[in-house]
Amino acid sequence: MLEIKELYKSFDGVQAVRDFSLALQPGKITSLIGPNGAGKSTVFNLVTGFLPYTQGTIQYNGQSLSGLTPWKIARHGITRTFQNLRLFRKLTVLENVLLGRQNQSGENVLNALFLFSNRSPEYQLQLEVSESLLEFVGLEDKQAELAENLSYGQQKLLSVACCLAAEPKVLLLDEPVSGVQPEMINKLTSILKELVNKQQKTIWLIEHDIDFVLKISDTVIVMDDGVIITHSDPKVIQSNSAILEAYLS
């Protein structure tokens, strides 16, 4: 279980995150919502090692994540996507996922790229896993395409596949359906539900699409000005017009 206690983060004396505490429910989908600047992405950056925190503790399965680099946290079983997609745009779709697999063997990027040029048993194994992930997200026919040539929605799917390549138990998704068409939202909804219901993944996401949030979430956390305002069932959030108006308008 991912457990955060009394987390603080300040930038030049300004508190961006204050007294943030959460025990993430395993095998569930938890959404973190709130206005721009509330501190949501900062929390994700703190949990995944992209920023150091000022005070507090973050533990996963009883082990402290303090001071760990993002790749070490990923090897603990926690991976993430970003609001601004971080793909290797000049590499193919398949190569992007293969690079995600390199965490499993401890290879660096250059070594992983070297694997692409041979047909070793290790390469074949990583190839099969990567192809199955692309099939899972519906990009099996785009393997040879450059990542930059995919539609924005397809790039979102690829980012999920890359996230899954490291075989995580917990996925942190930053605005997974932002800016995509309704049919792609439906596809991503189905993918995330299957990850939880059939693969026992735990998902924590940030999203501004309230309809998507209320439809998919088991728990919704509302955050503003660096603090948690409320933490509740989506039906309770949906019935609270004050919260919806104040934080999602």
Q: What are these model-predicted stretches?
A:
Residues 48:
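Helix-to-loop junction immediately C-terminal to a conserved catalytic motif
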